[in-house]
A protein has these predicted regions:
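Transmembrane helical elements of multi-pass membrane transporters/channels
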Residues: 25-40, 187-190, 194, 198, ...
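Hydrophobic alpha-helical transmembrane segments
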Residues: 127-134, 162-208, 224-225, 261, ...
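Interhelical loop/hinge segments that connect adjacent transmembrane helices in multipass membrane
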Residues: 2-18, 22, 157, 200-241, ...
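Signature of the first transmembrane helix
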Residues: 3-6, 17-75, 101-116, 131-136, ...
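Membrane-interface junctions at transmembrane-helix termini in multi-pass inner-membrane proteins
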Residues: 80-89, 139-162, 185, 206, ...
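Specific pore-lining/lateral-gate transmembrane helices of multi-pass inner-membrane transport
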Residues: 83-99, 258-374
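N-terminal membrane topogenesis motif
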Residues: 1-41, 74, 79-82, 86-97, ...
């Protein structure tokens, strides 16, 4: 690498150019996530019929613990690199070595703690799983700054391609191994191959090689920003994953697997849509943080498009949990249906709570984000632990109540940065959330009255009911109509730009 300013952010350009770039980026990443959802659902449908709740429970518990190591090895530095106005080649290389060093350190800690972890959950199979998952942490740590650079340069197509290819080959391997009777090792192998493909692919796509670590290269601003983001992410991660650990500790590894499959089934569409939305929103909004009018316009449009794309899926899951479980996991997982429905209720509010974090990160208000997280996430954890007194459904209820409470809390912190923006975010989100909850109630009512004779028929009836009620709301509710039209406008703009070469 010879370009001393290789990581300088692209210019914002004109409003139309940025709108098209954002729309194209959103379309590319959303389309990729749609493909990911299809692949993940296909893998889920097959693997759930080949593996047991205990198999899933083992990998879910270790995956949750490995996720902590993943956050530690990232330390918020990927977000720091994306958000910074300029990243020199030397800074990028130093950040790479910092991430890799942290990855090796915490992977080593996982290996050392494998025996105590297995003892805590009373299952010796966890020892091998923990040690192999540590390799995944190292592979991901190498790829951290390569992926950040691709995102920073708005190379969304390259990122999307890598994510799809890695997932497809990993899922294919897992299905083959599960079919041959490898049990939970099929899931471990999937994680390893997915990480390896992403590691190699991002390095090749990046087109640069890290220089040696140089002393004196300024990293303080990255470390300060990253540490605040990391603290917020760590608490957020704990609040989202403590339920799996609590389920395993209190009710055993199979119960943890049952709960985790319900949670992942609900989290899958949320993650696959909010992750690319955030990857597009953060660099775009960061470039607009000094232009209040354009910042708010892009923010509200992004929130609207995200909610109107995501919440119809949540509404169907909330209305038809038994049918969704039967189709996705099979009848042997029927006990997960009430858990799934409760989690879906919380997902309405969780989806609305992503845009406040965009505001705080894009404007550099990471201290504010940390203070919000220090209040909201411990609240979520307390509710989940308290709910565990009522069983697995109680854990899900604690999560749902926490999601409903933390949405307005997030807006209170945004209000300290941009008061008008917080108000508009709330009104915008309230329209989408309330409308889709009403749609879910209508879908559940129609399916209950018609009583279809199969899960697939019920899903078709539910989807048709959702479409009809959505159209009726657009006719009688102007705010709802504007949201639907905004989604359609974004899709149309993205299609208009689809013929242009991607960066």
């Amino acid at each position: 690498v010879t370009d001393g300013r290789a990581g300088e952010a692209p210019g914002a350009g004109t409003g139309t150019d940025l709108a098209r770039s954002a729309a194209r980026g959103a379309a590319t990443t959303t389309a990729a996530r749609a493909v990911r959802i299809v692949v993940q659902i296909a893998g889920l449908v097959v693997l759930a019929r080949l593996l047991t709740p205990e198999d899933y429970g083992l990998v879910a518990i270790v995956g949750t613990l490995a996720g902590v190591a993943e956050l530690l090895r990232d330390f918020g530095l990927s977000n720091a690199a994306i958000q910074a106005p300029v990243v020199t080649a030397a800074q990028r290389s130093n950040l790479h070595w910092v991430n890799l060093g942290l990855g090796v350190l915490f992977a080593g800690a996982m290996v050392a703690l494998a025996e105590p972890i297995a003892d805590a959950f009373g299952n010796r199979d966890l020892v091998g799983v923990v040690r192999w998952m540590a390799v995944v942490v190292v592979l991901n740590s190498w790829a951290t700054q390569y992926r950040a650079a691709l995102s920073r340069d708005l190379r969304f197509t390259a990122l999307a391609t890598l994510e799809i290819v890695s997932l497809v080959v990993g899922t294919a391997l897992a299905v083959v191994l599960a079919w041959q009777g490898w049990g939970y090792w099929a899931l471990v192998a999937m994680q390893l191959l997915t990480a390896a493909v992403m590691c190699v692919g991002s390095t090749l796509q990046g087109g640069w090689w890290p220089q040696r670590f140089r002393r004196g290269v300024p990293l303080r601003s990255f470390l300060r920003f990253g540490s605040q983001v990391f603290a917020a992410q760590l608490l957020g991660y704990a609040s989202r994953n403590v339920d799996t650990i609590v389920a395993g500790l209190r009710f055993g590894v199979p119960a943890s697997g049952l709960y985790n499959r319900a949670f992942q089934l609900m989290a899958m569409p949320i993650t696959q849509l909010t992750y690319p939305a955030g990857k597009v929103a953060l660099p775009v909004l960061s470039r607009l943080q000094d232009d209040d009018a354009r910042f708010e316009r892009y923010l509200l449009r992004g929130q609207t498009v995200l909610l109107h794309a995501l919440l119809p899926i949540v509404a169907l899951v909330c209305a038809l949990p038994e049918q969704i479980i039967d189709i996705a996991l099979g009848p042997t997982w029927s006990q997960a249906a009430p858990i799934l429905q409760i989690l879906a209720l919380g997902a309405f509010f969780e989806a609305a709570n992503f845009s406040p974090s965009w505001v705080l990160q894009a404007t550099g208000a990471t201290g504010m984000l940390l203070r919000y997280t220090l209040v909201a996430k411990p609240l979520m954890i307390v509710l989940i632990v308290a709910g565990s007194q009522l069983g697995l459904e109680g854990i899900a209820l604690g999560y749902a109540v926490g999601a409903a409470l933390t949405w307005p809390l997030g807006l209170l912190w945004v209000r300290r940065v941009r008061a008008a923006t917080a108000r508009h975010l709330f009104l915008n989100g309230a329209v989408a959330v309330s409308g889709h909850i009403a749609i879910a109630a209508c879908v559940a009512g129609v399916v209950r009255v018609l009583a279809p004779d199969s899960a697939w028929t019920a899903l078709v009836v539910g989807a048709g009911t959702l479409a009809v009620v959505t159209a009726l709301l657009a006719l009688v509710w102007p705010a709802w109509r504007r949201g639907v039209l905004s989604l359609l406008w974004t899709v149309q703009l993205a299609r208009a730009r689809a013929g242009r070469p991607a960066r």
